[in-house]
Amino acid sequence: MKKLWGGRFTKTAAQWVDDFGASIHFDQQLVEEDIEGSIAHVTMLGECGILPKEDVETIKKGLTKLLEKAKRGELSFSVTYEDIHLNIEKMLIDEIGPVGGKLHTGRSRNDQVATDMHLYLRKRVIEIIELIRQLQRVLVEKAEQHIETLIPGYTHLQRAQPISFAHHLMAYVWMFERDRERFAESLKRMNKSPLGAGALAGTTFPIDRHLTARLLGFDGIYENSLDAVSDRDFIIEFLSNSSILMMHLSRFCEELILWSSQEFQFIEMDDTFATGSSIMPQKKNPDMAELIRGKTGRVYGHLMALLTVMKGLPLAYNKDMQEDKEGMFDTVQTVIGSLNIFAGMIETMTIRTDVMEKATKQDFSNATELADYLAKKGVPFREAHEIVGKLVLTCIERGVFLADLPLHVYQQASPLFEEDIYEALNPYTAVNRRTSAGGTGFTEVKKAIEKAKQMIEA
C-alpha cells in the first residue's frame, strides 16, 4: 500500500521492515492529543488565511467526529500507516475526502509528535500531583490517630531511639511534598508549545504559533524551532521525578514488608492487598508492597534508557527518539497504579500499637537519654557517652534493660545519677522531651500535622 510520504520512493518496504519501524502499537495512546493538536492547528490555518474557511470547517468536523470515536474506543489502527499521526490523517481523508490532506499544511510530524507528548504528559502529571496529594491526606489522617503511639526508630536497621509513629508517617508526608513540588515545577517548563516548529527550521507559511499555544492551553511557545523538535528533556525530567517518587514509595514499602513479618508484627496488611501461597496454607504475603518495590526498578530503567538514547543524537530529530514513548507510557501507568495501591494499603492496614510500644521497652534505644541526662549536668557528652556505653554492657551481661538496673549501679557509674533517671528512661518521656523544631515530641508532631494540612490543601 502506498505511503502518504511515498512520492520520492520507487520501492516499498517489506512487511517485516514496516513492522519493525512502526510505532502505532504504542503511540496510539496519543490519539486524543493528536486530534486535539490537529484541531488547534487547522483552526489557526483558517484564522491566518492559509486555508479557506470552508475547508477548515470541513476538516474540523471530520476531526471532531474522529475524536468522539476515539473516546469511545471505536478507532482501528494499521501498521501500514506507521504511527498515530499518519493513521489519523488517513482516517480523516477517508472521512471527508482529499481536503483532509490539507491538514498537514505548515506542520511536520516532528513538531506534531512533540506537541502530542507535551499534551499527554501535562494531563498525566496533573493527575499524579493530585494522587500524591491524596496519599498525603491519608498519611496525615493516619498520623493524627497515632501521635502518642510509640515505635522504635532505627538507624542501620538497629533500634536507635523511640519515636512517635505519627512522626515516622509525617517524614514521608514531607518527602512526598517535595515530590509534588518537583512535578508542579516541571509543569512550568513542560507547558510550552512546540507546534509550528516544523521539521526543524520553522515554515514559510504565515502561521501564528502563539494562537495554537493558547488554543491548547500552553503558557507560551518554544523560542527556537530546532530546540522544540530536538529535545526530550521534558520526558527525562518526568522520568527523573517519577524515579525519586518511586524511590520514596519503595522505601516505605520495604518498611511495610518488614513490619508485617513475624519478626516485627507491627502491622498487618489488609487481605485486599495481600496474597497467599500455592503450597503453604498459612502464608499471607505483602505482594502489592513487593510489586511497588520491584516496579521502581522499571522506572529507573526507563530513565536510564532515554538518557542513553538521547546522549549521542545530533540535532534535530532522529528515529532513535521513537524510543521515548514506551518508557514514558509505562512509567505513567506504573506511577499512577503505585500511588493508588499504596494509599489503599496505608488506609486499610491494621496497626498493632501494643507490639510497637512493647518494642520500645525491650531494647536500649533509651540510652541516649542517659547520655543527655549527664550532659545536662555538665558532663562532657563524649564522657557521658562512655559512661552509658559501659552501663549498656552491664545490662547485656546481666540480661536486663536499662530501666531494670538498680540506682546504686547507676551511681557507681556516676554520682550525678539520681532517682529521676527512671523517669528519663520512660519511652514516653524520652519521646515527648524532644521538642526541638521538627522533633518527635508530641507537641511538635501536632504542629507538623497542622502545618502539613494547610500545605496539602494550599
From Swiss-Prot:
The keyword Cytoplasm applies. One of its GO terms (cellular component) is cytosol. Its EC number is 4.3.2.1. One of its GO terms (biological process) is arginine biosynthetic process via ornithine. Pathway: Amino-acid biosynthesis; L-arginine biosynthesis; L-arginine from L-ornithine and carbamoyl phosphate: step 3/3. GO terms for molecular function: argininosuccinate lyase activity. It is an enzyme of class 4 (lyase). It is found in: Cytoplasm. It catalyses: 2-(N(omega)-L-arginino)succinate = fumarate + L-arginine. Transmembrane segments: none annotated. The keyword Amino-acid biosynthesis applies. It comes from the Bacteria. SUPFAM superfamilies: L-aspartase-like. InterPro entries: Arg_succ_lyase_C, Argininosuccinate_lyase, Fumarase/histidase_N, Fumarate_lyase_CS, Fumarate_lyase_fam, Fumarate_lyase_N, L-Aspartase-like. Keywords: Amino-acid biosynthesis, Arginine biosynthesis, Cytoplasm, Lyase. Belongs to the lyase 1 family. Argininosuccinate lyase subfamily. HAMAP family: Arg_succ_lyase. This is Argininosuccinate lyase. It comes from Anoxybacillus flavithermus (strain DSM 21510 / WK1).
